[in-house]
Regions:
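Conserved alpha-helical substructure of the radical SAM core
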Residues: 2-120
Length: 120
């Protein structure tokens, strides 16, 4: 098997998950992507999130932030479920989320791999 990190067959490394799916069992996700905030420190003219056509949903605003208590609860659930990895990204800059280091530390201590997509 190719050891390329970007292989289309990377999912084959998760044999237990594949077996459980084949047995029609409910399994936790391997990877979760979280957008902790829409707040951004740039004002890029080409950004889709600045478009008047962007559909954020009825309950969302341009500068939304997931409340810390909710994100902490989500992090606890991710660890309990045995999720392998989390990526923080968003319509904003995830590193502007003030308590992100605490959440990342909790996930790391729980054995979850963490990545962040940033504009910096």
């Amino acid at each position: 098997m190719n050891d390329n990190k970007y292989s289309d067959f990377k999912f084959l490394h998760f044999n237990k998950t594949l077996k459980a799916i084949g047995e029609k069992k409910i399994v936790s996700p391997i990877h979760i992507r979280i957008k902790p905030t829409n707040v951004c420190n740039h004002d890029c003219w080409y950004c889709a999130y600045h478009s008047s056509d962007v559909q954020l949903g009825d309950q969302m605003t341009y500068r939304d932030v997931i409340p810390y208590e909710k994100l902490d609860e989500i992090a606890n659930d991710i660890v309990k479920m045995g999720v392998a990895a989390v990526t923080f990204s968003g319509g904003g800059e995830p590193l502007l989320y003030k308590k992100l280091p605490e959440i990342i530390e909790k996930l790391h201590k729980g054995g979850v791999k963490v990545a962040t997509l940033t504009n910096g």
